[in-house]
Amino acid sequence: MQLTSSVDLGYPVFERTILPNGLRVVTEQIPSVRSISVGVWIGAGSRDESPEEAGLAHFIEHMVFKGTTRRRGHHIAQRMEAVGGYLNAFTSKEYTCYYARALDEHLERALDVVLDLALDPTFPEKEIEKEQDVVLEEIKMYADAPEDLIFDQYEATIYPDHPLGWPVLGTPETVRSFTRADLRQFVETRYTPNRLVVSVAGNVEHDAVVALVRKLTAGFDRPPVPVERAPVNGYAPKHVVSSKPIQQAHLVVGTRAWGLEDERRTTVSILNTILGGGMSSRLSQNIREKYGYCYSVYSFANMLADAGDFGVYIGVDAGKVDRARHLVERELHKLATRRVSDRMLNRAKTQLKGSMMLGLESMSNRMMRMGKVELAFERYFTLDDVIAHVDGVTADEVRDVAAALFETERLSSIAIVPESA
């Protein structure tokens, strides 16, 4: 039995259908554009790996482009580029996405290509070793980029001995160990209908999308596999310092926070905007502009299904690391102990809402928003829903969330400093 629901408040029109096999189709119809963005989302990422599988979800994302039953590798990209379209993919901690952009007249082509990639890869043996070399070079590239490497070290500190603390790319040892059987086993047990979402935004009609998905997934009958994920374990703050042959020091100060299931998620977003959201933020004004200590400083909030973290990054001269840490912690302390002014709160709300609404000018952003929200909540939030949540946050709630997050004894710090420091 097929289940369909819709939210029609004028355009865009959101509709959602659950196919009999459990695969979900979500669309936003926007007739005023000529483009479409199509995504196939799999609710499986690096979090769903065993220690021996670390990096496997990402490696599969690479390998599907090497060929499917119906297409050789070079034909896959050519299929979209021939009509001026675009094809790509990415892997995160909790999901993998294969997506395409094209004109609305090429909807079937785009759906066909991304579903073919996700559901029918062949994983040619001769390509596996070559792609292992490619991914190993990708790992080296990140290892040579301290502003990226420090976040791997940060996540390992925030989520110790847990898949969320492992790098999405895996390690050279795990990547080199992957076999074709490993890839097929992961796909058979994670790329199942109950974990799949097809998300489409643009000048499309929902019923037409559903009909195409049904046609293109005929015979896709892998049995559903329950989503079982290890709960996050305990967190104990740590202070880690390492050195590399670099000229600038890199510092992250952060802590464990809450996941998307927590009602404080909107307050966290506003707090993040006040603290590190752009050149007018407190971090930028009170550290970069006031002291000239850095070029790059910002805050970040990572929110996963049932876990999250919040932190600050700063790139600074090696001789000023301790002073920079003190200045960052001072800003955190002020937010935790003092109520922000109504003017600052309203400015942050306006900034956050404006950023979200401008992002919705892009069909790709709309498609990605639907896919992520469906995987996380199995429902749809209208823009009015989101704005109401933002407008409902109070200054007291911002202070209370900051106080819960920024207790000094909860903060971890990770630094990568020059070897000569």
Regions found by a protein language model. Give the residues of each.
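Active/ligand-binding-proximal structured segments within catalytic/core domains
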Residues: 22, 29-82, 154, 191, ...
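Charge-rich, well-structured scaffold segments of protease-associated domains
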Residues: 2, 12-14, 18, 29, ...
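Short loop/turn motifs at secondary-structure junctions and domain boundaries
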Residues: 6-9
